[in-house]
């Protein structure tokens, strides 16, 4: 709103200034614009430019995976009929209203609000249950905060009930399925228990009864609000994952846990002092005196005693009865276990924060030892050390390949495109190239750092890489190494034609100049081998890149047209031969498949005939005995042999029938 008000004010002032000037001065004698008018115009232009939406980037649009159908498809799982677009749109809106995506930033902010309510109950419900002066100071204020937190709990129950979950990799948004899933989780029971109206106990146990004579205070009935602590852990996990400083956040989380434990233990000490009796001995809290009877003194002393006990420092009054001894022993044991764990976690966090520095220092020490062992000159050793220092100052010696190794290739390609977008735009031969080719090439870019005075390439060297300047200055020098012919800055590209190996290149794919780094320079390198490995899967892109490379060579007069034409004819003839060979292989495969089908069909027919003969044949009949079809084709004929039924007695009928069944072909 403030931005639009300022813009409107500037426009109104500008208009008034213009009208005033036109009325005061004649049209033929218009004076020059005043300084105020020029200032207002510049301010209006700046505000308009800032408010103007950023135009879409053509380079990133080629890699965009989101479409309109994807946006529509994010509705209910039952959206399958594309023809019913209106119903799909209506059901999508309805499901989206009844579901919450837990990955959205708005859901994370809501968790932060719920976490504040939970943290309030963790600290003040326990504290107000023991320190009665807190409730007496501002009861209306505390009741307002209590029921505000209850309202947040109620809203969070509705949000939690409609939180989407993943089923077979898809986010479920159907309201009925979300509620059914929620009612079968542990969170449902915790939410219900944390929302029980235990404040109804105030009817029989009024909060006004809280005093030094009646502890704990009635607010202790709200302890069930602490059961919503799982939402606080969820917010901690989300924050630790999303933050750019996870180690610092972990340390803050551990410190918060320590303070909460000390706070609870201080409340326990004050409650035990009440049970034993204030001022009854030297161990319990001494309530005598005006100063000791204040809330500030009571809490600070209890917190101090709790800190000394849990940290096992001691130096507290000696217990005098069994209850005091048991409480102190339990505190010491809890302090040893809890703080040993906490100190160990903090130590590991601090060591993890310095892992990159330690690894980098070890590598640098190893290089130093090697140079000392090989007696490398002091000048070269100093250059190496300066290179290490520059690398650490720029990127912290970050190994990008190792960091991104856990990601799939698709995500790595998208990250690389976002990071190297401006770099790839500078390469002329890659303009309007297939997105798949650029996705494959962007993963093969290697970052190289050159020190002052390092030669990136020399004249006459075989071109095996192309370079893209990311940061720094390069100079193109003559053969004497002194004369500067040109200066290259960020975004400059050189060597892109040499990696294409174009026949007819008068330079013979060799470097035509000496390129030297003026200061520390960061260059992206693309090797010829990586380029051609990628182009093997993109034949059309390969021909396109070759044509663009030829155009660049023709522009500089470095292409021999005759040699290039001859190579193209040879290449076309080879390509034609390969196509004919592929066509012949395809025809042979088709013929082989047809013959195999005929053979399989004939085998099936023969098996059917044999099975039919076996079923129809019986004793005293002629049976066909044949050899396999392969033998029959070799010249062997079928043979007919009579099978006579043997004479047998009536009681041997079963045996003769069994013997007849055993006659085979």
UniProtKB/Swiss-Prot annotation:
PROSITE patterns, A to Z: CNMP_BINDING_1, CNMP_BINDING_2, CNMP_BINDING_3
Compartments it resides in: Membrane
Protein keywords: cGMP, cGMP-binding, Glycoprotein, Ion channel, Ion transport, Ligand-gated ion channel, Membrane, Nucleotide-binding, Transmembrane, Transmembrane helix, Transport
Region (Disordered): 633-665
Bias (Polar residues): 654-665
Protein name per the record: Cyclic nucleotide-gated cation channel subunit A
Residues at which 3',5'-cyclic GMP binds: 437-559
Originating species: Drosophila melanogaster (Fruit fly)
Source superkingdom: Eukaryota
Gene that this polypeptide is encoded by: CngA
Transmembrane segments: 111-131, 139-159, 187-207, 254-274, 326-346, 482-502
GO cellular component: intracellular cyclic nucleotide activated cation channel complex; plasma membrane
PANTHER family: CYCLIC NUCLEOTIDE-GATED CATION CHANNEL SUBUNIT A
List of glycosylated residues: 135
SUPFAM superfamilies: cAMP-binding domain-like, Voltage-gated potassium channels
